[in-house]
Swiss-Prot record:
It holds the Pfam family Cuticle_3. Component of the cuticle of migratory locust which contains more than 100 different structural proteins. Keywords: Cuticle, Repeat. The keyword Oxidoreductase does not apply. This is Cuticle protein 67, isoform B. GO terms for molecular function: structural constituent of cuticle. Sequence repeats lie at residues 7-10, 14-17, 21-24, 28-31, 85-88, 92-95, 98-101.
């Protein structure tokens, strides 16, 4: 019910919800220095006259004091085979020769 008085609005003021924390920083021991690795890489393409065929080589090597790995790839291609069909040659079997019929 109505009590005849003036009611104040229900307003509350609070401090903003802000929290401050120390930054999360972790310090670790310095990383161990590993010995250097030696690497080498080479590639070569040898093409025939008229670029009808080619041989492609690729080699990569990684050497460390603990291991050694070598990867190599050799590919041979001949475009002349792909574009020129082999001639169709058919040979008949030789005729069978029997000894002549010879009667006495």
């Amino acid at each position: 019910g109505y009590l005849g008085g003036y009611a104040a609005p229900a307003i509350s003021y609070a401090a903003p919800a802000v929290s401050y924390a120390a930054p999360a920083v972790a310090y670790a021991a310095p990383a161990a220095v590993a010995p250097a690795a030696l690497t080498s890489q080479s590639s070569n393409i040898l093409r025939s006259y008229g670029n009808l065929g080619q041989v492609s080589t690729y080699t990569k090597t990684v050497d460390t004091p603990y291991s050694s790995v070598t990867k190599s790839d050799v590919r041979v291609s001949n475009d002349a085979i792909a574009h020129v069909a082999a001639p169709a040659l058919a040979y008949a079997a030789p005729a069978a020769y029997a000894a002549p019929a010879y009667y006495h």
